[in-house]
Amino acid sequence: MPSLQDYHVPYPAAAPGQVRKVIYLPQQNPTVEQQHLRVQIIPGRHENCEDGRLYKLTGSVTEETLQGWGYSYYVVKLGDIYAAHRSSSDPARVTTFVALDENPVIAYNSKLPIVVYVPEGAELRYRVWTDDTSLVQSIQQQPEAPALPQPHLVPVTERQECPHELPRCGAPGEYVTQDCKTSMLSVEEVHRLSSSTPPLIPSAVRGSAHEAHAAPPLHSAELEERVCPVMEHLEVCPQNNGHEGREQPAEEASTLKRRSSSSSSSNPRHHSANEPSPSRPRLSSTEYWPHENSKTKRSPSATHKPRRSTDSAAIEEAGVGAPKKNRSSSSSASSKRKAEDNVYEKTMKNFWNRARSDSPRKASASSKKSGNGSKADP
């Protein structure tokens, strides 16, 4: 621990009735000492406080400067005691430290000691204050904790990898070779077995699963042979008016052919392909479009000959293939319309002629009335 003589500073000796106290501060970073640290001087003395009340001392702390050196020292004067407040203290400790009412705060300087002159029987305490920045730096400067010893790792033996080729056992190999030697059944044998087995009945279905699966499956070629003869006797009707196609026997298809041919020869009606007749029976896929006869075909020149009549518009509206009755009716309707138009024109002409003939008569009548009035006035 350093002494006051180590600093070679001539501090004055203590006056009678006083004691010199010296505080030595630990050395810190100069910037931290100047900006982040402060020292609080707390002088006081021990007093008997039997009532358990807290007290304080009156007095003062004065700062003086050493002449010729410029160093500072402090002189403390203590006065009477007084009760600070009625908060309870430790009743077991009757004699307690009573601090001075004034506790000055000074700068932190580790290069020079803090010299304080206090009265005899007094005690000097101090407190170092710091801010958050210095606290963080002190925490960062603390030595790191020693690393914990790593646990001893026991080496683990590596597992042997399974070989790619496993040893073959005797029994499975024999079973596989025996299975490969069996020859596959031919199509004829499958057909013979399937023909010999009777069809399933409800009693057979209720049997065990072993009996149900006893019959061997049919080959694809055999299935095709069995399905084709059935399809030969059926004809599929085309889909018409949003209804799905239906299968009809060949006999019904032949009867439909006869009916359609007889109806087409007797009643030559013109229908569009998109408007199906409800009374006409459905045609089969082969008879959907009727065959055209070369004898019944007409050349476009024969059917579409230009005509010089004034009713060409009515003929075009009625259609090229319309009968003579329709043409005559259309011509009569057009002639009626023309006659009506002529009558309307005649009536309108007569109306305008009457209106024109009536206008001068009214004017002459008004002039006659005015002349008669003028003569009657004189």
Curated annotation (Swiss-Prot):
Family of this protein: Belongs to the protease inhibitor I11 (ecotin) family.
Basic and acidic residues composition-biased segments: 337-348
Protein name in UniProt: Ecotin-like protein 3
PANTHER family linked: ECOTIN, PTHR35890
Ranges annotated as biased composition (Polar residues): 274-287
GO MF annotations in UniProt: serine-type endopeptidase inhibitor activity
Region (Disordered): 191-216, 238-378
Species for this entry: Leishmania infantum
Transmembrane segments: none
InterPro entries in alphabetical order: Ecotin_C, Ecotin_sf, Prot_inh_ecotin
Organism taxonomic ancestry: Eukaryota, Discoba, Euglenozoa, Kinetoplastea, Metakinetoplastina
Disulfide bridges in this chain: none
Record field: compositional bias (Low complexity): 362-378
